[in-house]
Amino acid sequence: MRDYRDIIIKPVVTEKSMNLLADNKYTFIVDKRANKTEIKNAIENIFEVRVASVNTMNIKGKPKRMGRFEGKKPDRKKAVISLKPGHKIRLFEGM
């Protein structure tokens, strides 16, 4: 079993994700191999909250160029976590 901190990579801090905070939804970049159950367990254990639902989406990396060299940004997986009423993640407070 993987460590919970290996599943949750980082929070997403964008205008859209900050607007979702009003609906008690939090957005994170997660490990591409993680499923919804693993993500739910990781969030509940790291932040000590109760998760209502997990929505995930796979994001393809954009093509990038550096001079004559072509490449692409890495693919990633994003998870939108809905918490049960009365629960908040302190990491996002004050944003």
Curated annotation (Swiss-Prot):
<comment type="subunit">
    <text>Part of the 50S ribosomal subunit. Contacts protein L29, and trigger factor when it is bound to the ribosome.</text>
</comment>
<dbReference type="GO" id="GO:0005840">
    <property type="term" value="C:ribosome"/>
</dbReference>
<keyword id="KW-0689">Ribosomal protein</keyword>
<comment type="similarity">
    <text>Belongs to the universal ribosomal protein uL23 family.</text>
</comment>
<keyword id="KW-0687">Ribonucleoprotein</keyword>
<dbReference type="Pfam" id="PF00276">
    <property type="entry name" value="Ribosomal_L23"/>
</dbReference>
<dbReference type="InterPro" id="IPR012678">
    <property type="entry name" value="Ribosomal_uL23/eL15/eS24_sf"/>
</dbReference>
<dbReference type="GO" id="GO:0003735">
    <property type="term" value="F:structural constituent of ribosome"/>
</dbReference>
<dbReference type="InterPro" id="IPR012677">
    <property type="entry name" value="Nucleotide-bd_a/b_plait_sf"/>
</dbReference>
<dbReference type="GO" id="GO:1990904">
    <property type="term" value="C:ribonucleoprotein complex"/>
</dbReference>
<dbReference type="InterPro" id="IPR013025">
    <property type="entry name" value="Ribosomal_uL23-like"/>
</dbReference>
<keyword id="KW-0699">rRNA-binding</keyword>
<keyword id="KW-0694">RNA-binding</keyword>
<dbReference type="GO" id="GO:0006412">
    <property type="term" value="P:translation"/>
</dbReference>
<protein>
    <recommendedName>
        <fullName>Large ribosomal subunit protein uL23</fullName>
    </recommendedName>
</protein>
<dbReference type="GO" id="GO:0019843">
    <property type="term" value="F:rRNA binding"/>
</dbReference>
<comment type="function">
    <text>One of the early assembly proteins it binds 23S rRNA. One of the proteins that surrounds the polypeptide exit tunnel on the outside of the ribosome. Forms the main docking site for trigger factor binding to the ribosome.</text>
</comment>
